[in-house]
Amino acid sequence: MANILRTIIENDKGELRKLEKMANKVIAYSDQMAALSDEELKAKTDEFKQRYQNGESLDDLLYEAFAVVREGAKRVLGLYPYPVQIMGGIVLHHGDVPEMRTGEGKTLTATMPVYLNALAGEGVHVVTVNEYLTERDATEMGELYSWLGLSVGINLAAKSPAEKREAYACDITYSTNSEIGFDYLRDNMVVRAENMVQRPLNYALVDEVDSILIDEARTPLIVSGPVSSETNQLYHMADSFVKSLNKDDYIIDVPSKTIGLSDSGIDKAESYFKLDNLYDIENVALTHFIDNALRANYIMILDIDYVVSEEQEILIVDQFTGRTMEGRRYSDGLHQAIEAKEGVPVQDETKTSASITYQNLFRMYKKLSGMTGTAKTEEEEFRETYNIRVIPIPTNRPIARIDHEDLLYPSLESKFKAVVEDVKERHLKGQPVLVGTVAVETSDYLSKKLVAAGIPHEVLNAKNHYREAQIIMNAGQRGAVTIATNMAGRGTDIKLGEGVRELGGLCVIGTERHESRRIDNQLRGRSGRQGDPGESQFYLSLEDELMRRFGSERIKAVLDRFKLSEEESVIKSKMFTRQVEAAQKRVEGNNYDTRKQVLQYDDVMREQREIIYAERHDVITANRDLAPEIHAMIKRTIDRFVDGNSRAPQEEKLDSILYFAKYNLVPEESISLSDLQGLSDEEIKANLYERALEVYNSQIAKLRDEEAVREFQKVLILRVVDNKWTDHIDALDQLRNAVGLRGYAQNNPVVEYQSESFRMFNDMIGSIEFDVTRLMMKAQIHEQERPRTEHNIVTTATRNISAQESDLPADVDLAKVGRNELCPCGSGKKFKNCHGRR
């Protein structure tokens, strides 16, 4: 272990030596750039672009380009990047993460690699965690970029598609991570290429990269639509039932935060809902409602996991930032269960149309980099998941902050009493204090304590994040006391007021350890920026969440030996601090393993999504007749059906093929059994394909011009693809839940998921081709003078096909259809999974 650490440290030192040499080469251009007039300096941008077009690489241009930005920043912003900022900029250009402490000027550091990469003309995305930072950074740094001749766009959720398209077309685009993700998904749902807003994803520079790529890695971005459902009553019934339970009726596993009914709970459920067996196959839907009601009532906690807004909406609280996540909803019915629990209106369930996780979104960029003050603890995950390194950058000035040993109290009451005393003492002498909490509930509790003690203070949490920047900016003033949920206000510097340095600078007090060391380090890092004095102190108790869930028995044994009572003094021990960090490492390891497993599942979806989106993009952008593609679909559909029935007895086989042809390919009266008798399977395929092409050509002939033909083909294909893909996403979600249980049978759930999802994907492709074939052949297309609108085309196709979608021809003899043959109704499903089970 010691050797591994030594190797890592030596590698970091070697990397820093290289970066210093490169930074010195940039600095060597300083006098040359300073001697240029404003116009000459601005002209460098066009010169660099031309040199890039002539074959020079961005690496070749790096030293001069960085020097130009440095000089430009001095003239426009009055800021001159330090050597350490140049080093950070080089790391960013190389597609890695420079770990730069709070207050070291990460925003200015980013200007150099952003400018350099924008010269390629393929777009640079500067990604922030919220729209306040998006607008702030774009406005402040945009002044420099515009002065140097580059265009800057701001992408906000409220902007129209046209405004978004304009923002993405700029050399540099500022946006939040979520908006880039949603725009990507929406772009892959449009019917016309001109409605897309994004260019291909080129280079992303992510601010607070650990927050987005680690903390929110598992968060799926979901575009969904409402599902017609009458399930509100079930949510309320399940909620009423769960609220009637005693503690003995359910079992909670604290570490994993899972819950289920005990035997007595199952008995009560069967009595309450008048069932013989709760876990009968017919009651699967009901058990899902009960499970969600259990989670909502006994796992999800008000003011910690979510808050109720003034508009009576359930808003999710981000566990890592303490902010409410506007527009986000828990999936799979959990959000509705919480709404029923809190007595607010239960909103309709939705169906997922498209989804992607941040892990897979950002891995799509040609080059990815990011900035943060705390990434080294997650170095392995950055390397394994995103193939990017973490390089610690030295501070411009030595860190003067004093980090005190943790203080441990036996109970929450005694801990908070000590916190209030500490805050009061520091407030009286004028030292500003920032108190960090992990939940809204803790903020409110501590705020009441401070009010009772007569200490004026500000509270920053999920309930008032709109004042976030203002509260944080004032947190360094003399006598200021600020309570901040977790890392609220991250991205805004706390500058010390007059006379505060002499009082010891900003004191940061943590009211408990977070499950991630990185989050604790972020809180500490709010103090002691740019060599300022400061202090940090963590107060812990045995009743803290981390200690309850993961505290080791050794800690408890030590405390028993000390025989602490609530009134007695606190423990301060290096051994204890090490034990807490060991618990944190265990949690971090668990979380990393979870994210890794999520990625394994999501990679399956990613591969399938990329295939569907690529095919979809080809259809959208094709400015040609799509007949060759449609002909191929028709041929494969015919081949698939004939092959699927090839082993059936001859009479049954011909009957099935005849019904298939009549109701999916050609007019009923145009084909009979005699047309198929005496033909081999290959001859039948050729015969049906020839007939189908005749029908296809007659359908297309009804459309007066080429534009109408292309429009009809595109809309028809996209409608089918989108419907099938939406159903497939739902099916994959259900599969993922199902394969988890197979682990009990010694099967690897991920391998099972990969295998099963591959089969389902192939089935979906077959189903898409079947539906395109059937719609193309059976849609009623009236001769027309001009192209019909997308809406009319789709409506006609839907209206004329929907009646046949699941209706069985009256003269079908079901007894003659084989279980594994395709159902003659034309659904594309096997008979045993369709009309064969009715």
Curated annotation (Swiss-Prot):
GO terms for biological process: intracellular protein transmembrane transport; protein import; protein targeting; protein transport by the Sec complex. Its cofactor is Zn(2+). It is an enzyme of class 7 (translocase). Keywords: ATP-binding, Cell membrane, Cytoplasm, Membrane, Metal-binding, Nucleotide-binding, Protein transport, Translocase, Translocation, Transport, Zinc. Its EC number is 7.4.2.8. May bind 1 zinc ion per subunit. It is found in: Cell membrane; Cytoplasm. HAMAP family: SecA. Part of the Sec protein translocase complex. Interacts with the SecYEG preprotein conducting channel. Has a central role in coupling the hydrolysis of ATP to the transfer of proteins into and across the cell membrane, serving as an ATP-driven molecular motor driving the stepwise translocation of polypeptide chains across the membrane. This is Protein translocase subunit SecA 1. It comes from Streptococcus gordonii.
